[in-house]
Amino acid sequence: MVKLDIHTLAHHLKQERLYVSSEKQLIQRLNADVLKTAEKLYRTAWIAKQQRINLDRLIITSAEASPAECCQHAKILEDTQFVDGYKQLGFQETAYGEFLSRLRENPRLIASSLVAGEKLNQENTQSVIYTVFTSLYGNCIMQEDESYLLQVLRYLIEFELKESDNPRRLLRRGTCAFSILFKLFSEGLFSAKLFLTATLHEPIMQLLVEDEDHLETDPNKLIERFSPAQQEKLFGEKGSDRFRQKVQEMVDSNEAKLVALVNKFIGYLKQNTYCFPHSLRWIVSQMYKTLSCVDRLEVGEVRAMCTDLLLACFICPAVVNPEQYGIISDAPINEVARFNLMQVGRLLQQLAMTGTEEGDPRTKNSLGKFDKGCVAAFLDVVIGGRAVETPPMSSVNLLEGLSRTVVYISYSQLITLVNFMKSVMSGDQLKEDRMALDNLLANLPQAKPGKSSSLDMTPYSTPQMSPATTPANKKNRLPIATRSRSRSNMLMDLHMDHEGSSQETIQEVQPEEVLVISLGTGPQLTPGMMSENEVLNMQLSDGGQGDVPVDENKLHGKPDKTLRFSLCSDNLEGISEGPSNRSNSVSSLDLEGESVSELGAGPSGSNGVEALQLLEHEQATTQDNLDDKLRKFEIRDMMGLTDDRDISETVSETWSTDVLGSDFDPNVDEDRLQEIAGAAAENVLGSLLCLPGSGSVLLDPCTGSTISETTSEAWSVEVLPSDSEAPDLKQEERLQELESCSGLGSTSDDTDVREVSSRPSTPGLSVVSGISATSEDIPNKIEDLRSECSSDFGGKDSVTSPDMDDIAHGAHQLTSPPSQSESLLAMFDPLSSHEGASAVVRPKVHYARPSHPPPDPPILEGAVGGNEARLPNFGSHVLTAAEMEAFKQRHSYPERLVRSRSSDIVSSVRRPMSDPSWNRRPGNEELPPAAATGATSLVAAPHSSSSSPSKDSSRGETEERKDSDDERSDRSRPWWRKRFVSAMPKAPIPFRKKEKQEKDKDDLGPDRFSTLTDEPSPRLSAQAQVAEDILDKYRNAIKRTSPSEGAMANDESAEVMGDGESAHDSPREEALQNISADDLPDSASQAAHPQDSAFSYRDVKKKLRLALCSADSVAFPVLTHSTRNGLPDHTDPEDNEIVCFLKVQIAEAINLQDKSLMAQLQETMRCVCRFDNRTCRKLLASIAEDYRKRAPYIAYLTRCRQGLQTTQAHLERLLQRVLRDKEVANRYFTTVCVRLLLESKEKKIREFIQDFQKLTAADDKTAQVEDFLQFLYGVMAQDVIWQNASEEQLQDAQLAIERSVMNRIFKLAFYPNQDGDILRDQVLHEHIQRLSKVVTANHRALQIPEVYLREAPWPSAQSEIRTISAYKTPRDKVQCILRMCSTIMNLLSLANEDSVPGADDFVPVLVFVLIKANPPCLLSTVQYISSFYASCLSGEESYWWMQFTAAVEFIKTIDDRK
């Protein structure tokens, strides 16, 4: 190995620390930004959809809503407030949230309820349909919501259209549930907008350019469009042959124009079939497949219905009203253009139906001019999609991992929805879905919640807004939660629910407040906030697991996806909220972070997920029952549990909060165990504690994570038996219950891990594992995660707990008392099957409880020798003392080594609860090796404690010695009293552990195994022991190991034995390096047991890493190499290079008066001085190796940052789209209101047109137009419709009025001299046409610089100017010219990046573009703008207008003959 340079190492470590710190800060900022953007997105989307629904009401102008009411409603919508649901609904928010969540996940029930409501003629069915789309499915922003809605549509086809006598008529009427929902969906679907824009923009603009005549093909209607005078002028004398001939000629001409137009539309339809939305195609193919099976329907009829759906309901509305869909934004559509668009839409539908039904005989002639299969071919492509059962999902989901956590719904909508469901239930129209609806409604409160002032809710933003009393809701208020792919599927599904529902329907006139109701999510993990340990252990479990399949997505694949969008911004909030929540868990941040992240760390997670799914449906209702029980007494409300639902707060001293079982149904536990056993059978071996040599992780985290989740929801809250009840039977049953429910099995580790974080704030109340797994723990989970990651390196192995000793002992008593469930529990015993390397001594009698449990057998060989050292059998094989001794000798490890090994493993395997005064202390690093904490099944007594954790460490010794006395006195109390006392925190663990270790050495000596296993002690009666077992079982549940800690200890203790020879061959030890200043233990704990080399080595390595990563290179000594290389092997430790280095650092700290750094460095130097040179070199080599192995953590941070940046960018793009939709809807709303205003002033407008015709001077015409526009603006200001309009809406309205008025007088204003102007334009047009044949980009008359010729002929600029005829107002025409000029400048800048194009470069290109585009009526355009807009030109507009007129004049002078 290359000799290490301490200075280089320190340099690298400092770089690493700075980089990790800055990355974490950036990731935290990104998490906050993503949440802000997501919140804004959902609020904006909610308002935008309500505006769209309001617009539809205005267009229909139904009796229920006058234009004035619609305008008022639009104003109110803009001011919508979002209010947390609990403020309005109180504790009932939970029930409503669950109702909405379960309803949302049942598309079939929604569809059957809507159909039943229609059959019952419920008047609010339509508003409920709006609520389903906008609130329940959140406008389908999230892909999962879209998938659910597609399934609702599929069921509607089955229940509504398939059952109808005349489904086609039902569909065409457009009032059935399917039609309304399809319209809402297709209007909001972004891919549908893309398809419509790509297909229709060009042909519609072309139609607007040529909108001079109505393309009427019916001769009778054509004649009616002209006054008698015009008829005579155009066609001659009425009734004559010449008249009929002229009319027919005009009809033929119109037909030819129409055919050309329609062919253009069809061509674009075919060209853009590739971007037809997959989800719409899926609906059409589902309709075709479902209805084709109906006997009474012909295939042609079914095809006709698909055609209606595609054309009548999707494409043709966009053809007729393109501005409503954003296809055309600034070009006004006048009456002539609208008529022509309707003609196109009608022809498209007729062509699609060719061959399937008899058309109108009069249209057959015109249809004969088309290719018969032109539209049918397009339909075949769409209908021909394979009708797969599951809705299509996008292959690239940029929001993967994001999920919705709330529903936006107004109070009135919520009540309407609930009442609708109740009326459907009572209407007896439901068939097989009746039971499901009954179950849903059963959990809803009977009384209507009182309505408070604010009704809205905010989905994501509320972490900051929610009061501290509602921690859980804060979490749920976040609309976006993360789904980690490595977590269980149930978690994913839960999270997804919440985000999307963010909208409310418009059934009430003033829904200015929207409730944000939480759907109740499970635990979530914030991207980038995993600690170093967790990431490295995931890496380790993925890379080296032999027995279990590796999930590539865990870490190697895409941790950025695994943990990418767990955007629970409550982490920030949780920090302030934590202490008030659970006073005992100051550093619960660390624990929760670790436990959450480790849920998915293990490789066999998928199997665990299957087990979870098996149980999910059976346990789903248990939580509901609990809610009902608590609700009866208003307990949730009184205890402040409305949101947090932390059951531990409500438990009385005699309550049992066991998971799953109660005294009254003792068999449930065993049944549940058998189910778990069956579901997880194949996981048992995978989750064994394998030896390091085999590359396996100590514990399989995933197997456990699944069960914990299922058990979490099933609580029993029965009162425990009192002391006076028959103790034997009751306690025996209770013990079985505890054993079965507190996470013994190989699949339950996660439960136990998670319990740590949800330890009740009352130290005396020990609660079984179920609490932790409830989703309400999340607030602290994330908060904990944040704090853990805020340390320098983020990683810590565990946090010491005041109860650690008791917890540790608890592991030994799990199966002590004989019980009928013992054999069944054997496979779930963490000692026998989980830590597969040691077979457990399982006595059949109650043994005396020794003061310290024995260590487990050696587990070192794998780490040191590379071979697996396994006991002969797994399971419940009982080892005699002799066998144990023989095994030890066979694997020849010194006794001390064996003990240190086993204790390290087990102690690290238990995750302690954090105590306020011992925040973030890496527990497994500080536990001495001999303090075995869980290797055997012997009974261990809980120590009662009388000192608080903040007491001096010296108290620990006296506590320990008082143990046996305390136990005796403890026995005289009722068992539940003992539970409180023994659960009280004691002296901090590291000291007590050392005391125990010294006693081990004194009392037990090398024959500890035989002493412990052979000597029964009469001190405890069987009954008292059972009671103690129960108590320790409770404690033990909290101490289960997290995979990361287990893996850690496995390597670390192997690394340094007395001679320091162990190879550093496993990345697991890396996690031990992840410490910050907070993690340093006091020197007291170091002095307590200096002879423990394994512990000291790890401790020194930790401290030295901290010293190195904060050192400054300026302070490096110069001659360290010669000093180090010249040292003989046994020189004094003061002289080695680490000490020299530290001395310089101490000097610098003294110079800077940095007291904290001085203390750290001095402590580090004191520890280093105890090692010889060789060990110091190994120390540096180990730190360097750890540094190299931390590369995956750096990669993890980078991927998380990239993932968050991608998500943020995508959310911003989604927000842009939503804002654009909202703008389009608002502008169209204004246009409709203007149309209504002008209709009321039609008489005035006609008078104005007549006056305008009489004028001849251009100035007079301009003045008259200006005066009339001002008159209309004044009328608008006084109109009741416009009373609530904003300034922006008034400006839009003025623009709309100007466009409408100029449209009416366009020909009079544009051609003041009529035929003279038209002929003049025609002459110039022909001249330019001749020029375009001979002029090229390098023509000598133009002199375009050669550098700009590469972009010729500038087609995008040509297409801009060609559309100038579509605009009718002088302002819009100038804007069109500006867009052309700016396009040319962009292209010129692109061609030559070194210089800015000037006028000499620009004008020749402008001339060339005008020649090639040859827009019609150039001279009249110049005259029109000069007359009506010249006085308004200024700034940039004026400059480009001047360039444009100069170019037109220059074109007139070019001679095409030269």
From Swiss-Prot:
Residues 147-385 form the Ras-GAP domain. Its main location: membrane. One of its GO terms (cellular component) is plasma membrane. InterPro entries: DUF5601 (IPR041545), RasGAP_dom (IPR001936), Rho_GTPase_activation_prot (IPR008936), VPS9 (IPR003123), Vps9-like (IPR045046), VPS9_dom_sf (IPR037191). GO terms for biological process: endocytosis; regulation of protein transport. The modification Phosphothreonine is found at T390, T458, T470, T762. It is a peripheral membrane protein. Residues 451-473, 578-588, 758-777, 1010-1022 have a biased composition (Polar residues). Residues 930-951 have a biased composition (Low complexity). Residues 1318-1458 form the VPS9 domain. The modification Phosphoserine is found at residues 227, 466, 566, 569, 742, 746, 757, 766, 876, 902-903, 908, 914, 964, 1017, 1044, 1076, 1083. It is found in: Membrane; Endosome. Residues 778-789, 888-902, 952-973, 995-1006, 1061-1071 have a biased composition (Basic and acidic residues). Present in adipocytes and fibroblasts (at protein level). Ubiquitously expressed. CDD domains: RasGAP_RAP6. The modification Phosphotyrosine is found at Y460. The record marks R172 as: Arginine finger. GO terms for molecular function: GTPase activating protein binding; GTPase activator activity; guanyl-nucleotide exchange factor activity. Residues 447-475, 574-608, 738-821, 846-867, 888-1022, 1039-1072 are annotated as: Disordered. Belongs to the GAPVD1 family. Acts both as a GTPase-activating protein (GAP) and a guanine nucleotide exchange factor (GEF), and participates in various processes such as endocytosis, insulin receptor internalization or LC2A4/GLUT4 trafficking. Acts as a GEF for the Ras-related protein RAB31 by exchanging bound GDP for free GTP, leading to regulate LC2A4/GLUT4 trafficking. In the absence of insulin, it maintains RAB31 in an active state and promotes a futile cycle between LC2A4/GLUT4 storage vesicles and early endosomes, retaining LC2A4/GLUT4 inside the cells. Interacts with RAB5A. Interacts with TRIP10/CIP4. This is GTPase-activating protein and VPS9 domain-containing protein 1.
